[in-house]
């Protein structure tokens, strides 16, 4: 009888990173959620949505020969750059590669599978086991099989000090922390885990808007680079009505010579749709909440959360754009 991988277990957000008694914590990786299974030599590598990804990541298929037969792992596909940072953009660029192109990409930007859960072991369904038992069995697989790249064992801890240390790893691409109850079973498609995503508050310059200046829907943000050029760094989520009304009185339509004249902006990361924007004078500083994910150009990959306008700050006081 063919074993079908279950839907992945999911997580719900937490407002803070406190590790509670009876729970374990793991780093949250900036990659692609994936399930990998091997059964009688047949390897399956599926995305969170059930898409087969093995043709794009042949090194995972080759490495699966070192796993016990009739075994399945839950984890995250990641790519590290030469500096040891997670390179999400390179990971995503590999999705469309096939055949020789996928092989070249595997050599240039090898993917790793960071395993954080065990769903099946040598034909035994382990999803009904408590997390602590699944975790111990997963560690035993890595030890007994002496697994190395492309396999990586995700750290797990019950020590709050270790969690605090992980939260300082944002610069290398750790998105936050996942929390799992030690006695919890693996529940497909259920948000039984908890997650805390690292976000930082920072400043940027409001340089354009979507919608109208009387009622902006989103604000496009910039920062000056080391040569004094205003670079696009990201855009906000939709401000609240109160925030929108406050911002409206602080925006000045752009005069001639705006540095973004003639530019177009994508409606979303990876989207070909462009935004209909109105340029404004790059004078107003905004305080925003952003997470750690950046693209290769140094832009925020996810929308920034509007906190407040900072008319008390000059654009020259905003952190410099870093690519």
Feature locations, PLM:
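Catalytic cores of nucleic-acid ligases and guanylyltransferases
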Residues: 1-323
């Amino acid at each position: 009888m063919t074993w079908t991988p279950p839907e992945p277990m999911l997580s719900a957000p937490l407002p803070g990173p406190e590790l509670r008694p009876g729970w374990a914590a793991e780093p949250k990786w900036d990659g692609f959620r994936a399930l990998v299974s091997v059964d009688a030599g047949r390897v399956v590598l599926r995305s969170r949505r059930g898409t087969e990804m093995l043709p794009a990541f042949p090194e995972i298929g080759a490495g699966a020969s070192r796993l016990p037969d009739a075994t399945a792992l839950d984890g995250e596909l990641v790519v590290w750059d030469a500096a040891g940072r997670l390179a999400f953009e390179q990971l995503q660029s590999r999705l469309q590669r096939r055949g020789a192109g996928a092989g070249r990409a595997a050599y240039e930007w090898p993917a790793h599978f960071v395993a954080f859960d065990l769903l099946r072991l040598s034909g035994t369904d382990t999803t009904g086991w408590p997390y602590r038992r699944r975790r111990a069995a997963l560690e035993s697989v890595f030890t007994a099989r002496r697994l190395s790249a492309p396999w990586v064992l995700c750290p797990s801890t019950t020590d709050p000090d270790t969690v605090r240390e992980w939260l300082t790893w944002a610069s290398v691409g750790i998105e936050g922390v996942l929390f799992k109850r030690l006695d919890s079973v693996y529940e497909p498609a259920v948000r039984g885990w908890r997650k805390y995503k690292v976000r930082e508050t920072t400043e940027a310059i409001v340089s354009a808007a979507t919608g109208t200046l009387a009622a902006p829907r989103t604000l496009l943000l910039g920062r000056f680079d080391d040569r004094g050029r205003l670079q696009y760094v990201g855009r906000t989520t939709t401000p609240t009505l109160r925030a929108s009304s406050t911002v409206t009185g602080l925006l000045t339509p752009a005069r001639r010579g705006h540095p973004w004249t003639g530019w177009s902006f994508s409606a979303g990361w990876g989207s070909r749709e462009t935004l209909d924007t109105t340029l404004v004078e790059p004078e107003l500083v905004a305080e925003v909440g952003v997470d750690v994910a950046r693209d290769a150009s140094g832009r925020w990959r996810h929308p920034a959360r509007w906190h407040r306008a900072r008319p008390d700050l000059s654009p020259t006081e905003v952190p410099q754009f870093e690519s």
